[in-house]
């Protein structure tokens, strides 16, 4: 209780310097100024804390491969300077007068969505990621609720968001590991439940990285029999430790034999160019394959119409993160069942190095930035 009171007192003391004269919120973060993965400090402002908004002081921010694709201009033209980060965990520092979901001092998170039209059929169903007007993303989105300003992400000290689009983080959550759940967690949780995977099902995960190792944990918890497909021998031990019954090195032709028509469900998390037909052929009749990996545009995998004909009643579908209600459901489930990403905590002055390691395939699962180190990164950059 004393810690909470001290936190609130501190927020009151700094409030006069936190807000610009027009009510906008000063923020500082680490930004890319070109497609080269190099970060420098950036001071900017976020929109004012409205009646239905909360201000979150960011504690941890995950690094997603999507951040890198966007920063490197690999999906669509990027507006620089660019502050990435859509896996955000922190503490509520201020609430608008109409806010009921949060109070100052609560833990709160932000995933990939910070707003949407709220009026279309998808939004009314809690499927905000499919908003007919377009979801407003955590970064590099035109925020049509706030004069079309370009959103900046969570590699920063704070974020302003509508309470409706913020996720409640349970008090007992492991804050150092919770942030990636808000993207990697829901991205894999959603299709697994959409396809109604159940105990005893024979399933596969293609790609054992940030997304893949989350998928394995959810599938194992459900009691499914999981086979993992990846490119190297280096991840075989990790596959076993995570609970997989088998590991297949796709570069070993001997191991690939006998895999066709074997699985009722496959989730592909591969963020590079590959042949999806190889995995479709591994499905049983009526089996389903969910594609969640998002490579750079030039590496997008394709399937011809004839390949789909020969898929023979096997289903292939894409899955995009999850809506706000499902994200909350996923987070509550994950914390209750101790399902977390395996992370490496890094200081803010190591983002350059972390990006390069992800690009080079040298990261095992997930990097998380300790945003308490932001001030030190800013000071060291000025030297």
Q: Which role does the model predict for each range below?
A:
Residues 112-164:
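Cysteine-cluster motifs in flexible loop/terminal segments that predominantly coordinate metals
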Residues 195-202, 225-315, 374-383:
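Glycine-rich cofactor phosphate-binding loops and adjacent beta1-alpha1 units
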Residues 22-25, 324-383:
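C-terminal hydrophobic helical "lid"/dimerization subdomain
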Residues 21-89, 153, 157-161, 372-383:
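Short N-terminal strand-loop motif that marks the start
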Residues 1-22:
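Bacterial Sec-dependent N-terminal signal peptides
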Residues 157, 164-166, 170-252:
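Mid-domain Rossmann-like dinucleotide-binding core that forms the NAD(H)/NADP(H) cofactor-binding site
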């Amino acid at each position: 209780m004393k810690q909470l009171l001290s936190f609130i007192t501190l927020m009151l003391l700094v409030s006069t310097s936190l807000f610009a004269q027009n009510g906008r919120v000063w923020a500082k973060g680490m930004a890319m100024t070109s497609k080269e993965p190099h970060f420098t400090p950036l001071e900017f402002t976020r929109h004012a804390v409205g009646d239905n908004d909360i201000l979150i002081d960011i504690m941890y921010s995950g690094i997603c491969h999507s951040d890198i694709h966007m920063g490197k201009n690999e999906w669509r033209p990027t507006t620089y300077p660019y502050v990435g980060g859509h896996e955000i965990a922190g503490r509520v520092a201020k609430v608008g007068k109409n806010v009921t979901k949060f109070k100052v001092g609560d833990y709160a998170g932000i995933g990939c969505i910070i707003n949407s039209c709220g009026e279309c059929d998808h939004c009314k169903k809690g499927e905000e990621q499919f908003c007919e007007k377009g979801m407003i993303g955590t970064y590099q989105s035109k925020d049509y609720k706030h004069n079309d300003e370009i959103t900046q992400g969570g590699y920063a000290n704070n974020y302003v968001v509508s309470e409706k689009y913020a996720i409640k983080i349970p008090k007992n959550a492991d804050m150092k590991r919770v942030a990636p759940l808000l993207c990697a967690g829901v991205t894999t949780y959603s299709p697994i439940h959409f396809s109604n995977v159940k105990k005893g099902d024979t399933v596969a995960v293609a790609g054992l990285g940030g997304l893949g190792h989350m998928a394995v944990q959810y599938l194992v918890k459900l009691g499914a029999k999981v086979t993992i497909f990846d490119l190297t021998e280096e991840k075989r031990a990790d596959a076993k430790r995570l609970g997989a019954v088998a590991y297949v090195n796709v570069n070993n032709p001997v191991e690939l034999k006998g895999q066709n028509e074997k699985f009722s469900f496959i989730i592909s998390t591969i963020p590079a160019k590959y042949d999806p037909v190889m995995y479709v052929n591994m499905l049983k009749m009526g089996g389903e394959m969910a594609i969640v990996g998002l490579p750079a545009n030039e590496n997008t995998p394709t399937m011809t119409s004839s390949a789909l004909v020969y898929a023979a009643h096997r289903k292939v579908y894409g899955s995009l993160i999850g809506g706000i209600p499902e994200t909350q459901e996923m987070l509550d489930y994950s914390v209750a069942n101790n399902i977390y990403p395996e992370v490496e905590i890094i200081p803010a002055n190591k983002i350059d190095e972390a990006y390069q390691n992800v690009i080079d395939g040298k990261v095992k699962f997930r990097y998380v930035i300790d945003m308490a180190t932001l001030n030190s990164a800013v000071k060291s950059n000025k030297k």
